[in-house]
Structures are given as C-alpha cells and as structure tokens.
Amino acid sequence: MNNFGKYNGNLNLIGPIIREKRKEKGMSLETLSNQLLFLDVNIPITSLHRIENNQRTVRDYEICAIAVVLKIDVQDLLNPIVEKFKKL
C-alpha cells in the first residue's frame, strides 16, 4: 500500500477536529457544504465526510473557509495538531 502523503495512514489530521467543531455548532454536513458555497468553496457532502474521516486531503483555503462558516479561528482547528507534534 502506498503511504506517500499520509501520516500514520491518514490523509489529514484535521478531519476529526472539524467534525467535533461542526457538531458543537449543531451543524449538519449538508449545512456546512451549503454554507461553503456562499464563499465559493465547493466541497460536496461526500467529500466533507471523507475529510472528517481522514480519507481526503484538505486544502489551505478549505480550512480557512470551514473556520469562517463554523465561526471559529483557524487556530482552533490547528492547535490540537500542533500540540500533538509537540508531545512527540
């Protein structure tokens, strides 16, 4: 199996954090997908599901747009990952 571009078999580390923040806001994948369209960022529900399950990479502009829609700071999504690496 090719693990190029993966970390511990995952294509991203931010997906579960996105899911957690989305659920905290009581937002469905469908609502998130629809709200992203207002920012000209097209991430279908199936792709959001794959992101949240570490099965799809996430582009920098997608992370920023997701943070805007969730009304959180980008650092709220990134800090848990930074802290994980600090502990290594």
Task: State the predicted function of each range.
Residues 26-50:
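Short alpha-helical DNA-recognition segment
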Residues 14, 25, 41, 56-59:
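Flexible coil/turn residues that form the inter-helical turn or adjacent wing/linker of helix-turn-helix
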Residues 32, 62-70, 77-78:
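Hydrophobic micro-packing sites on short alpha-helices
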Residues 53-65:
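Short, basic-rich loop-to-helix N-cap that marks the start of a DNA-contacting helix
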Residues 18, 29, 45, 60-63:
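Helix-turn-helix DNA-binding elements, focusing on the entry/boundary residues of the two helices
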Residues 3-8, 68, 75-88:
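Short, charged recognition helix plus adjacent turn
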Residues 1-25:
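A short, Lys/Arg-rich alpha-helix, primarily the initiator
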Residues 21, 35, 51, 80:
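Residues in the recognition helix of alpha-helical DNA-binding motifs
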